[in-house]
Amino acid sequence: MPTSTETLTTVETAKQLGLLPEEFEKIKEVLGRTPNFTELSIYSVMWSEHCSYKNSIAWLKTLPKEGPHMLAKAGEENAGLVAIGEGLACAFKIESHNHPSALEPYQGAATGVGGINRDIFTMGARPIAQLNSLRFGDPKLEKTKWLVRGVVKGIGDYGNAFGIPTVGGEVFFDECYNINPLVNAMSAGIVKVGETVSAISYGKGNPVFIVGSSTGKDGIHGAAFASKDLTEDSAKDLPAVQVGDPFQEKLLLEATLEVIKTGAVIGMQDMGAAGITCSTSEMSAKGKSGMNIWLDKVPTRQENMKDWEILLSESQERMLVVVKKGHEAEVQAVFDKWDLNCVQIGEVTEGERLKYYMHGELVADVPAESLVLGGGAPVYKREFKEPAYFSESKKFRIED
C-alpha cells in the first residue's frame, strides 16, 4: 500500500478498493484533480453499497418516511424515533451483520448487537430490549452448526455483558443461506420527547471529540467488505471483522447519557461502518459545515498506524461528539469519571470541506456532501426481472 499522500492513484487502484472505473472518473471530477490514496480510500468506503445504498436507494426513497407519531423521518437519524405517549418516545433500529458473521460468527454477531445499541443511546435513549432474526443454511452441514453456535453465543454474550435482555427472536434454515447467513439484530430504547441528540455538526470553532475505546486496525475497509459477494475465498478478509467489548460499551452508555444531560453536546454519532470517515462526513453534511481533523491526536492501540488506517478503522465502542465551545472541561470530566478516552481531534469549520491532517500535513481534502447517501454518492437503477419461481408461486390458490 502507498505510504505517501503524494502517491496519485489510478483506475486500477480504484478497482482494487471496490470502486468502478466510472466512479473513479466522477471522484476526479468532484475534486478537480486525481485523488491521493487516502482520499480514494475515503470514497471507496463511503460509496460502498453498505454506506451509500447506491443500488437500492432509488427504491428505498419510494417508501413512506413520516407519520403522525414519528419524531424523526425514516433515514433522518441513526435510529427510528416514535412517540409512545406520556412524553416518551421509543428509539429502535434493526441492522444486519451478515458478512462479518459468515467469517467470524461470534465477533460478527456480537459487534452487530453493539452497533445497534450505540445508535440507540447516541440519540439519548436508554436501550431496554433486544431481538434478532436469523437465517442459516442446511442444519446438517458442519459449517451451519459452527455458524449457529457462534452467532447465538455472540448475541447472548454481548447482550448479557452489556446488561440488555434479548426478549425474542426467530430462526429459519434453508440451503440458500449455506454460504451467507442473515444475522439481523434489533434494539429498542426509551427517551423523553425533546431530550434526543442529533447526528449533526455546526458552529465554527466548536471542538470535535473522539470518545470511548482506542482505535486499532480491526475492521479496516469493513464497509467495502460488507458490500462484496461472499465466496469460498473470503476468509482472507477476516481483518475486516470488528472486535467488540461489551463492558467498555456499558461504560460508554452511562457516560453518553450523562454527558447529554449537561447540555454541552451539539451532535453525536456512533463510529460504525467507515469509522471516523463516516461520522465526520455525515455529521458535517447534515449541518452543512466542515471539519479540520487531526488524525495524530486519535488514541490508538497500535503504533505507527497510517492516516488512512485511522480514518477507515471500524474499532468498536467509539463515538464522535461535537461540543459547544467553552464546555470542553465539562465533557472531559464526564468521560474521565467513566475511565474512557475523551480527546479533542478537531474543530468545526465554515464551508463544507473535510480536511484531515497527520502531524501537520494535510493528507486528505474532500467535500463532505460528495461522500454521503442522498448527497454526492452514486445512485444506480439496475435492470431487474421477475424470477421464474415467482410466477409459479402466484398460481397457488389456498382453496386448491
Where are the language model's segments positioned?
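Glycine/proline-enriched, intrinsically flexible loops and inter-domain linkers
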Residues: 1-400
